[in-house]
């Protein structure tokens, strides 16, 4: 697990970045996935986020915007139903390379236009 967060009252504020710093000892490659759970209160058909990795100096090492379709054209959820939440396992980056040892901060930014974003229960960024 690289980072995780459960959201108070299932609400995620727009500029409440989810982040964690890890110490990378040697050159490594990760297959990164995001597990995210939504309640029935989530009002949108998709979810947008920005994933950023910062190097030891605080400079952006990699950054990418993502948009995931959560519901079909009729508004039905695509994700697996677990514990009354719709849970998705989403690929973030296959073979994400960190070439130099050091401390790296992984950050996920809610990139949806409305704050707070209602219906987000929890998320976990993990290496496969």
What are these regions (language model features)?
Residues 65-97:
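An anionic, turn-rich surface loop/hairpin at beta-sheet edges
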Residues 25-32, 101-102:
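Extended extracellular/luminal ectodomain segments enriched in beta-structured repeat modules
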Residues 34-42:
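Short amphipathic, basic-aromatic surface patches that mediate peripheral association
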Residues 43-49, 119-120:
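Short coil-to-beta strand junction motifs in C2/discoidin
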Residues 42-44, 58-61:
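Mid-length scaffold segments of soluble, non-membrane domains
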Residues 98-128:
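Internal, hydrophobic beta-strand segments that form the core of beta-sheet-rich folds
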Residues 1-25:
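Transition segment at domain starts
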Residues 55-59, 74:
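Solvent-exposed strand-loop boundary residues in beta-sheet-rich modules
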């Amino acid at each position: 697990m690289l980072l995780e967060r459960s959201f108070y009252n299932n609400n995620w504020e727009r500029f409440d970045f989810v982040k964690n710093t890890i110490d990378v000892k040697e050159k490594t490659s990760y297959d990164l996935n995001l597990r995210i759970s939504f309640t029935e209160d989530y009002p949108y058909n998709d979810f947008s986020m920005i994933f950023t990795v910062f190097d030891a100096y605080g400079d952006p090492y990699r950054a990418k915007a993502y948009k995931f379709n959560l519901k079909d054209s009729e508004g039905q959820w695509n994700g697996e139903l677990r514990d009354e939440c719709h849970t998705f396992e989403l690929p973030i980056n296959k073979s994400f390379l960190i070439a130099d040892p050091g401390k790296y901060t992984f950050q996920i930014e809610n990139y949806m236009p409305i704050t707070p974003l209602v219906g987000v229960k929890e998320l976990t960024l993990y290496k496969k």
